[in-house]
Amino acid sequence: MSVLSLVVLSLLMALPPASCQQGRGNLQPWMQGLIAVAVFLVLVAIAFAVNHFWCQEKPAPINMVMTIGNKADGILVGTDGKYSSMAASFRSSEHENAYENIPEEEGKVCSTPM
């Protein structure tokens, strides 16, 4: 069997190459540019598709908005029914539902909590 393989291999090596195996040369410059632009656009489309499916925002939790009467107030998740005592320290004396924006001096910069 090895002798037959050796004879077939030597015959294949002795034959001239087929015409389809010889190179035709370089492509024209405009064709190279067209191929480069097409490949670039395909890669950008793939990147947009991956970004769209990979980076989708997760749906918000159900208890994110609490409705009081006809007004919706945003609440933090996990703080449902809890009162923050920090809010009482900067309530406005003019209106019960308003807060004071107390300025704090830090050198030459005037900053406020909001």
From Swiss-Prot:
It is a single-pass membrane protein. The modification Phosphoserine is found at S85. This is PDZK1-interacting protein 1. Forms a heterodimer (via N-terminal transmembrane helix) with SLC5A2/SGLT2 (via TM13); this interaction enhances SLC5A2 transporter activity. Interacts with PDZK1. Residues 1-28 are extracellular. It is found in: Apical cell membrane. One of its GO terms (cellular component) is apical plasma membrane. The gene is PDZK1IP1. It comes from Bos taurus (Bovine). InterPro entries: PDZK1IP1/SMIM24.
